Every structure is written in structure tokens, then in C-alpha cells.
Amino acid sequence: MAVYTEVSDADLAAFLEHYNLGRVRALKGIAEGVENSNFVLSTETGVYILTLYEKRVEEGSLPFFLSLLDHLAARGLNCPQPVRMRSDGALGRLAGRPAAIVTFLEGVCRNRPSIADCARLGAALAQLHLAAADFKGSRANALNLEAWPKLFAPIAFRADEVKAGLAATISAELKFLQANWPRDLPRGIIHADLFPDNVLFLGDEISGVIDFYFACVDDLSYDLAICLNAWCFEPGGAFNIDKGAAMFGAYASLRPLSAAEAKAIPTLARGAALRFALTRLVDWFNVPPGALVNPKNPLEYFAKLQMLQTIGDARELGVLI
């Protein structure tokens, strides 16, 4: 989450005329994240999250995201629910941007997830995949393997400003992934961005999964690979196989991996590392002046990629085969 677009009091009041939420009590921008403009909105009826969708989110995909949230919530997943307007719609416009209001979930993120937290995350991800299995909507992954060279091309000449030799590293990894990307794995709705800052905890239990604005149809095991990179490395960069084993074990207890999925995890993890390294690199060079946002260091994910390049067997990552 972040704030790229400011909202005036007058614009907000006019926008809220479409809802039955009462008068505004407070609006506070959220600096975390990098994609959309997000605010904690307090009104006479409660606390909500207001999101203005920025350029990386396709406006045509917004009905998919909001319908998915309704679907998952109806199946018992703790996720935000879109707040309906008086017209029964969930999507409007504010400050020149598409905008929506969703329910606020109580809880805090784990900055340093424990092994037990990784197990809970694995179970929650499996529950998400199973709950979404009968969702009728579909959306292609706009940041899949085919998109990565296009992300890289406009910034390739600047990559070595971040680290010497980075451009060559990226080019070589793209060639490897294009030649070795697994095919014909089980597919379905994935979250595609399930970092620790998108999972809320109350005590020892997960109280909510948030920020579904990269959700799409892709390999289910690719979602696991994204989580592996986001949850199972220590702050200093070392991989924690116990966290990996806890996550994979809890996931597989609800949705067992096929042999092909398990074998593919190392390559999928390399792809996931490159995907987030590239989008962070793009954002590093393109922070709008005055935006309330904290761009994330792309080198964190290049370091993870470097480690993953040494893995020859999924069991080295904690996958149970």
C-alpha cells in the first residue's frame, strides 16, 4: 500500500454521498506498499480501507478483484469485503482515479515470521486456492514470464547503476527461465503477492489476508514459490529450510502437491525472485515526486535469486517429495 494521489476533503465528501457510511471522521494515508493509493477511512459507521487504483492496476480488472473478494469471503476466507454503494455497485471514481472502499480487518503484520507463522501461512494459502476453485472469473497474469523481458527492456541501460553486472545477470536469468519454465502444472486463482505485509495476525492466528490486486489465474505452485521467497528467508538473507518445510507441509496437508509441482518449485522460485526484483527495479527508478511511498530495495530479491540459482533439488527448500 502507498499514497500517490492526494484526496481533498471536498472530493471525499462528494464520493461518500454514494454510500451509507455517514460523515467522515478521519482519513489517513498508508505509506507501506508500492502499487495503489490507500487510506484508513474512519466514518460515523466504522473504519474502512479506501483505495485509489493507480496505473499498474488495469481498470478493466477491478470488477474481477472485487468479485473475487466477495466470493472468498462467502466461503469463509478472512479477507476484505467490498462496501456497496447505494446503487449496489462497488466501484466509483475519486480524484480522477477508480476507487473502492472495503472493510477493515483487525490484526498486525509479522515483520519477522516464525516457523509456526510460516505453517499458518501455508495452510491459509491452500485454503485460498481451494476456496477460489469454483470462482467463475478469470484474469491472466499480467506479470508472467512473457512480461518480464518487457519490464526489463526500458531500464536495462540503468541496471548497473544499482549494482555492477546486474544487467548481464538479469539477461542470463531470463534466458534460463525461458528455456526451463515448467509447463502443464495445475492452475487456478492465485494471490500472486502474499508477502508478510499482506497477512494479518491476531495473537497466533491469521486474522486476514489482504491486497488481492495482483490476483490472477496461474500455476498454483507459483503462488507457493512467491511465498517461499517472501516468508522463508531471514533478514540477513539466509534461507531457513525449517520455515520452508513448515509452509510446504501445512499447504500439502490441505492440498497435496503433484510430483511435477514439487519438482518445479526451485525454478518457480527463481522466476518469482526475478519478477519481484524487476518490478522493484522499475519502481526504484520511477518514484513520482512527492509520493508517500517507500520504494523497496531490488537488491534484496537479486540476492535471493543468487541463492536459488545454487539449488538443484526441491528438498533443499523444504519441499516434501
Swiss-Prot record:
Signal sequence region: none
GO biological process, one term: threonine biosynthetic process
E.C. number(s) listed in UniProt: 2.7.1.39
Family annotation (Pfam families): APH
Keyword Nucleotide-binding attributed: yes
UniProt GO molecular function: ATP binding; homoserine kinase activity
The entry's keywords: Amino-acid biosynthesis, ATP-binding, Kinase, Nucleotide-binding, Threonine biosynthesis, Transferase
Pathway(s) the chain acts in: Amino-acid biosynthesis; L-threonine biosynthesis; L-threonine from L-aspartate: step 4/5
Database matches in InterPro entries: Aminoglycoside_PTrfase, Homoserine_kinase_II, Kinase-like_dom_sf, Pseudomonas-type_ThrB
PANTHER family assigned to the protein according to its UniProt record, in alphabetical order: AMINOGLYCOSIDE PHOSPHOTRANSFERASE DOMAIN-CONTAINING PROTEIN, AMINOGLYCOSIDE PHOSPHOTRANSFERASE DOMAIN-CONTAINING PROTEIN-RELATED
HAMAP family: Homoser_kinase_2
Protein name as it appears in the record: Homoserine kinase
Organismal lineage: Bacteria, Pseudomonadati, Pseudomonadota, Alphaproteobacteria, Hyphomicrobiales
